[in-house]
Curated annotation (Swiss-Prot):
Binding site for a divalent metal cation: 8-9, 40, 92
GO MF terms held by the record: 3'-nucleotidase activity; 5'-nucleotidase activity; exopolyphosphatase activity; identical protein binding; metal ion binding; nucleotide binding
Subcellular localization(s) per the UniProt record: Cytoplasm
Name of the molecule in the record: 5'-nucleotidase SurE
Disulphide-bonded residues: none
Role this protein plays: Nucleotidase that shows phosphatase activity on nucleoside 5'-monophosphates.
Family from the record: Belongs to the SurE nucleotidase family.
Pfam families in alphabetical order: SurE
Amino acid sequence: MRVLVSNDDGVDAPGIKILADALRNAGHEVMVVAPDRDRSGASNSLTLDTPIRAKQIDMHTYSVAGTPTDCVHLALTGLLNYDPDIVVSGINNTGNLGDDVIYSGTVSAAMEGRFLGLPAVAVSLVTLYREGQQAPQYETAAHAAINIVAQLKTDPLPADTILNVNVPDVTWQQMRGFKVTRLGNRHRSAPCLTQTDPRGHTIYWIGPAGPEQDAGPGTDFDAVRNTYISITPIHVDLTRYQALENVTRWTDRLTAHMDWPT
């Protein structure tokens, strides 16, 4: 298969290099189009107010001065002279669990591939690495990815489906298997952090993500905690269909006494 690989950690991140190598070793034709620097948290942002520069690093790699969404959009609308068969985004250097997906550039790169008509997978490693501990197990996540891509080749999923894959940070031999999950969610984020710059002005840092809230059985949080690879099918239609009837009644009450023109 012709695989387009992107990420949000940047073109030089270890995860994307290990993923691309693993896919090539599995027999796929791989093109990497990724941001020139870390663009974590970029979500679905698309650059519209300035031109975007893309630098070809080698025959199989482009570095783009833009967001993850920019990278996939450019690759599929003119940068490449062929059409890939699938988009694989990752390997992210931390998990994208629950409502992380709203902010994730990793997931958004896959989502852009789906917007433009291709099957898409986002792969994240739920890292446990701390100073002095074992290095992150990117090879485990890469092994999961090549198996998922192989299955998609022979057994495609519905056209509106994106797979959000979160892999525990353990060796493949320690893994308990795959588990299909739903997104959990977190408590409210911690307060922003304030500091004072050298000129005396207050500056702000976004605070840490909130702790797990909805993280019980069936969620992506629970699967990873129990050493399963979490596969969550997501899609881009944000309509809350269960609320349509209730909101229709609410809107009827809202408009009941308004003098609309006939």
